[in-house]
Amino acid sequence: MLYSLVKKYLFSLDAEDAHEKVCKILRMLSSSPFLCNLIDSQWGYQNPKLENEILGLHFPNPLGLAAGFDKNASMLRALMAFGFGYLEAGTLTNEAQVGNERPRLFRHIEEESLQNAMGFNNYGAILGVRSFKRFAPYKTPIGINLGKNKHIEQAHALEDYKAVLSKCLNIGDYYTFNLSSPNTPNLRDLQNKAFVHELFCMAKEMTHKPLFLKIAPDLETDDMLEIVNSAIGAGAHGIIATNTTIDKSLVFAPKEMGGLSGKCLTKKSREIFKELAKAFFNKSVLVSVGGISDAKEAYERIKMGASLLQIYSAFIYNGPNLCQNILKDLVKLLQKDGFLSVKEAIGADLR
């Protein structure tokens, strides 16, 4: 009830202005352990059936917050109090950048979806690292999503990813290379097996922490499988599928620029994840993101082969009790099908 009133006010504002107001509050809350504990007591949820050890990291539950919400790693402590099993900060770039011109964030309310053309706006890796360290250590795993600066030519992209990774080596529990945002010109062209191979070979020499590749939902299936195979062969530990889509047919009144996320992406993301899991389940850690807004969809992705999940748009539309609701209902679904834990359900449809 309370969030419905808050949401009504926030949705009366420009989408990015509303986000900035929320972020300001979350940054303030992050500085208070007492308030974070209070939030956790209200909206957190713990159940041993949802715990899992993946790549040497302990996840209290499989539901994470996707990159893009906390671009500068400045409000992680507050965000984790809302029940997330892990968080992904960023996207951070080597140098600070302002992103694309506003307006660049839009709501498609009927479809419970968002469209963003942000363009990796962030304070840069150095300040991102400083923000991260301010409230460390954290209770859950934290991923760091890394991107390429807009002004960097394609020929120097590998050097740019190396530079941003180098600055972030002493923060985070895993790293995600973002080659799939539609909002940096030509970035998606780097989704090819040659560049991906070079990228992960480089990263493996720099860190022993888990490395992930985040892919677009708009790839042809054969291309996607080829790119993923190249990444895993070069040392990637996991694949995050998917980023936002440029398929404007999924909403009634799309804006010209930007990628779509939310419920409009559910079917498309599920379909590409199904193909990904058929080929790479048990060969890599698979993370499903895109249009997950309830326990039923979360459970389907887990049975399809997802060890972990991520949400973003649903958090905007449903508010602070979303994680708790999904996780409670997920436990009920596991029990109904006779699974003793979420670990047993991962990939059940493939067995």
From Swiss-Prot:
GO biological process, one term: 'de novo' UMP biosynthetic process
Entry superkingdom: Bacteria
EC number(s) reported in the record: 1.3.5.2
Subunit structure and binding partners: Monomer.
Binding site for substrate: K71, N116, A117, M118, G119, F120, N178, N183, N243, T244
Gene3D superfamilies attached to this UniProt entry: Aldolase class I (3.20.20.70)
Protein name from the UniProt record: Dihydroorotate dehydrogenase (quinone)
Compartments where located: Cell membrane
Cofactor(s) this protein requires: FMN
SUPFAM superfamilies recorded: FMN-linked oxidoreductases
Keyword Repeat: no
Coiled-coil region(s): none
CDD domains according to UniProt: DHOD_2_like
Binding site for FMN: A67, G68, F69, D70, K71, T91, N145, N178, K214, T242, G262, G291, Y312, S313
Membrane topology: Peripheral membrane protein
Reaction catalyzed: (S)-dihydroorotate + a quinone = orotate + a quinol
Gene behind the chain: pyrD
A GO cellular component entry from the record: plasma membrane
Family of the protein in this entry: Belongs to the dihydroorotate dehydrogenase family. Type 2 subfamily.
Pfam family, one: DHO_dh
Major localization class: membrane
Annotated pathway: Pyrimidine metabolism; UMP biosynthesis via de novo pathway; orotate from (S)-dihydroorotate (quinone route): step 1/1
GO molecular function, one term: dihydroorotate dehydrogenase activity
